[in-house]
């Protein structure tokens, strides 16, 4: 995960997300992990404000990298293969955390939820006017996604922290693809791929009743 500290470029993340789905619409975990590493670089480039999310994401990515590099790596090539493997071998804690707190299914679910928040926030940045308040955009995205899984104390602290967010222009410049209007255009290309990966993952987890894993 050392490369999570290097510079962010939205084009690189776009390429990674384009590679996430194969011809069978399976979510390939290597490009999924690579995509998230790029998003972590974006969050880290904006300072410590998003550290409560990026630190958790980094820990989850390390778990997934261990699974991909372990003796059962062939079962972790895609999200679909992972779900089938872990469910058939009872490697998932379905009702309460006990024997498998670092199962791939639980780990990806946390990444999946965070991706929903980031997708909503980036879409807000893309479609909002130049003078839009990023604190409001981020809070709205958070309340529509991650907030449901955080205790009140965390929700309160996060909402207060959002008030210190930089301007919309600073966010767009942090994407390193040129002027703000070019970043908006690039987001328009990237977000449909992110949305597609999210939708396929959501459908898979819903089909197997995995959306509320402890």
Curated annotation (Swiss-Prot):
Outcome of mutating residue 60 to A: Nearly abolishes phosphoceramide transfer. Induces autophagy in a dominant negative manner
UniProt subcellular location: Cytoplasm, Cytosol; Golgi apparatus, trans-Golgi network membrane; Cell membrane; Endosome membrane
Organism ancestry: Eukaryota, Metazoa, Chordata, Craniata, Vertebrata
Name the UniProt record assigns to this protein: Ceramide-1-phosphate transfer protein
Effect of residue 106 to L: Nearly abolishes phosphoceramide transfer. Induces autophagy in a dominant negative manner
Family affiliation: Belongs to the GLTP family.
Binding site for an N-acylsphingoid base 1-phosphate: 56, 60, 106, 110, 150
Effect after changing residue 158 to N: Abolishes phosphoceramide transfer
Chain coiled-coil ranges: none
The UniProt record lists the keyword Ligase: no
Catalysed reactions listed for this entry: N-(hexadecanoyl)-sphing-4-enine-1-phosphate(in) = N-(hexadecanoyl)-sphing-4-enine-1-phosphate(out); N-(9Z-octadecenoyl)-sphing-4-enine-1-phosphate(in) = N-(9Z-octadecenoyl)-sphing-4-enine-1-phosphate(out)
Keywords, comma-separated and alphabetical: Cell membrane, Cytoplasm, Endosome, Golgi apparatus, Lipid transport, Lipid-binding, Membrane, Nucleus, Transport
Bilayer topology: Peripheral membrane protein
